[in-house]
């Protein structure tokens, strides 16, 4: 059986849809990676997070910053997030926590965006 032109076009469309990454999200992820070293870090918090609100997995974040950081605010706005409504810190360059992580695990309660590059509502455990 010979493949028809319709079969070929359907296969091409599926391949393009699967392999294409949203350019906007890719640009935002790159921007987060770029600013991670420029943001003002958050000091250790004196409050203990409610562990029942932590989203699994616990994360290892390159840095934590305030949601109102002027460098980060445009990225949050691009994602439709109002920084003033975030409770806790914003984690940058996050990935699932392992024993090899150089920082304490992060409890993030609100979201894990851009493939872990950005996490909201974070605090150190």
From Swiss-Prot:
Cysteine disulfide links: 54-107, 60-101, 61-94, 108-122
GO molecular function: structural constituent of cell wall
Signal sequence annotation: 1-20
Entry keywords, A to Z: Cell wall, Disulfide bond, Secreted, Signal
Quaternary structure, from the entry: Self-assembles to form functional amyloid fibrils called rodlets. Self-assembly into fibrillar rodlets occurs spontaneously at hydrophobic:hydrophilic interfaces and the rodlets further associate laterally to form amphipathic monolayers.
Sequence similarity: Belongs to the fungal hydrophobin family.
Protein name: Class III hydrophobin G
Lineage: Eukaryota, Fungi, Dikarya, Ascomycota, Pezizomycotina
């Amino acid at each position: 059986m010979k493949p028809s032109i319709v079969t070929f076009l359907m296969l091409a469309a599926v391949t393009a849809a699967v392999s294409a990454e949203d350019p906007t999200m890719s640009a935002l992820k790159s921007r987060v990676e770029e600013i991670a070293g420029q943001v003002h870090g958050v000091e250790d918090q004196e409050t203990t997070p409610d562990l029942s609100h932590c989203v699994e997995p616990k994360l290892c974040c390159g840095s934590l910053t305030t949601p109102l950081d002027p460098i980060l605010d445009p990225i949050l706005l691009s994602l439709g997030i109002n920084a003033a409504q975030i409770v806790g810190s914003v984690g940058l360059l996050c990935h699932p926590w392992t024993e090899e992580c150089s920082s304490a695990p992060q409890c993030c309660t609100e979201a894990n965006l851009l493939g872990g590059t950005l996490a909201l509502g974070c605090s150190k455990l």
